[in-house]
Every structure is written in C-alpha cells, then in structure tokens.
C-alpha cells in the first residue's frame, strides 16, 4: 500500500492540547512572578508574661502584608491580625481559653495588593507553645509587711491574669494553685548575709532579731517546670524602727529633763527657805545691838 506523499494536515486535537499546555505554563509563571517579592516570616517567637501573649516575627514588610493563624494542636486554624504590616500579633484571647493546651501559629505572607494573588500564600510555622508551662512569671508585689518584736510578717499580692472563669479574671494563684511558690530573701539592714524562706501560700511569718531592721524581696517560683521557673525579684522593702526609737528616746530625755527641773525647783525652794531662815536668825541676833 502506497504511502501518501502530500503535505501533513495538522490534527486539531493536538493543537488544542499544545495551547492548553502553553496557557498553564503562563499561569504558573505568572504565579511564580507574583510571589517573588513576597518574603516569608522568620524568627517567629512567643512573648508571654502572666499569660499575656504576643507572637512576634521578622522582617518588616515592604511590598507585602501578613496574616496570622493560630490553632490548638488538634484544632482548626483561626485567622488573627488580617493583612497587617505589623510584625507582632496579640493572641492572648485565644490561648487563655485553655492555658494547658499546646498551640501552634503560622504567619502567612501576601502581596501588598492581595486582590491580585491567585496562589496559596507562603507561610512559616512557629514553635509549639504551652502557656501553662512556658509563660513567664511577672514581677511579684509585696502587698504589706510588719515587724513586731521578733516576728516579721510579709504578704505577697498575686498578679491578675487575663484568664477567665465564670466571667471573672483569675489570679496566678487561681491558675497555678499549689504549683505557685514564693521565696522570700531577707537580711539585716546592717549586713549582707541573706536567708530565705519558701511558701506555697501568700504569707510569710519568720523569726527575726528584736530591734533590728530587715530588708527583703520576694520571687515567684513554679518548681514543677523545667524552664521559666522563676520570676524577676520584687523591689526591695525594708523595715524601720526609727520612729519607735525616736519616741523612746524622746520619752527618756523628757523624763530626765522633768527630774532635773523638779530637782532644780526643789533645790531653789530649799535654798530660798534656808536663806530666809538665816536672814531671820541674823535679824534676831542683830536686834539688841542695834537697840543699844
């Protein structure tokens, strides 16, 4: 059978296929070109103190914006901080729903003109974060203190958190219970040698030397933690006996002065009487001589 020698007629199906393939390549190329200026986030970190939690990352955007998503380990993603030019996002309201849960966040990068984006945005995942185990403890506050004789009584005030239960904000003690300890460091004002006492309540009652002034500060501690166990130390407070000593000294000086005044008055009266008696005697003795 002879083979036709005429010109080959193009197949319509093949032409359509080539056109579709070319179009797909163009679309992919446009997608790649559209994302070349989008920089993905890096150095994503959780900054959390007393459960107030901020997600931070780099870099500052130039031609793009960010959206943050957060999710419990086995939950669904929830969008936060939509199309922002900031490099931080407050996610406190999400993590306080269950502070014992482990959370993951991711930062998505979009072109500045998000309406032109037709591809899935690139993103970067954060490290996992468990608030109960990892939030930093804030600086505690000494609510009150009193030294009476040989006893020093110190009361620590619990910080409030944004964790809620029954529509009320909880304190650190409410959240951590007996896991929360306080350590009191104290020393004589005239010395540098420190002692310490620890309690899982909010009060200290320690033995001290009577008449000595003491200085002290407290620190919150979660002993069950492996990291972030301790808070910063509270400002130093000191007892003072200056007013008591001044009152006692004033009383002593006043008493001595009163005794001296009484002594002077008595002495003056006595001397006056003695002089009067002597004068009378002298007058009697001199009377006959004067008469003569």
UniProtKB/Swiss-Prot annotation:
Residues 1-35 form the signal peptide. One of its GO terms (biological process) is positive regulation of platelet-derived growth factor receptor signaling pathway. A motif (WKS motif) lies at residues 46-48. InterPro entries: FN3_dom, FN3_sf, Ig-like_fold, Interferon/interleukin_rcp_dom, Tissue_factor, Tissue_Factor_CS, Type-II_Cytokine-TF_Rcpt. Its main location: membrane. Keywords: Blood coagulation, Disulfide bond, Glycoprotein, Hemostasis, Lipoprotein, Membrane, Palmitate, Signal, Transmembrane, Transmembrane helix. A lipid is attached at residue 274 (S-palmitoyl cysteine). It is a single-pass type I membrane protein. The chain crosses the membrane at residues 249-271. Gene3D superfamilies: Immunoglobulins. One of its GO terms (molecular function) is cytokine receptor activity. Initiates blood coagulation by forming a complex with circulating factor VII or VIIa. The [TF:VIIa] complex activates factors IX or X by specific limited proteolysis. TF plays a role in normal hemostasis by initiating the cell-surface assembly and propagation of the coagulation protease cascade. This is Tissue factor.
